[in-house]
Amino acid sequence: MRNLSTLVGGTAAALTLAAAISCGGDDSNNSTGPSGSCTPSTNPATLVIQNNAICPQSITIARGGQLTIINQDSRSHDMTSDPHPSHTDCPELNQIGFLNSNQQRQSGNLTTARSCGMHDHSDPDRSTLKATITIQ
């Protein structure tokens, strides 16, 4: 009986460890994006949408630059500036707007130093689809 309980306990521990790893239990290399949900672009002025998540969720862009968003998700997204529903923080971000799956678009030139939030207008409360853009 003791061997059976040891086997069951060991199996449960192994399953727990496997679940933690497969759910992105180690997010040490991706502190600004949702763990295991999205792979950031190698372009520093680009956000990527995958699996209902945007990453990274925090990005810094030089004044005068533009933000690019690539929608690699299976559904469309309507990316706009905060706050919802007025979208007035950074109107330049509103030029990105509606993105079909596998579509990308750029913002207007971000010329004013500030910090702006953005979100998916169609799903404004989903935290994994919110990002902060810092313009320096």
Segments (PLM) and residue ranges:
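Sec-dependent bacterial lipoprotein signal peptides
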Residues: M1-S22
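Bacterial Sec-dependent N-terminal signal peptides
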Residues: T16-N43
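Extracellular secreted precursors and ectodomains with disulfide-bonded cysteine-rich loops/domains
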Residues: I21, G36-S37, A53, T88, ...
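Extracellular/periplasmic metallocenter environments
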Residues: S28-N29, G97-Q136
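N-terminal edge beta-strand
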Residues: T39-Q66
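Beta-strand cores of secreted/periplasmic/IMS beta-sandwich domains, seen most often
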Residues: Q57-R75, T80, Q104-T112, C116
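Acidic glycine-/aspartate-rich tracts in secreted/extracellular proteins
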Residues: Q72-R75, P83-H87, P124-D125
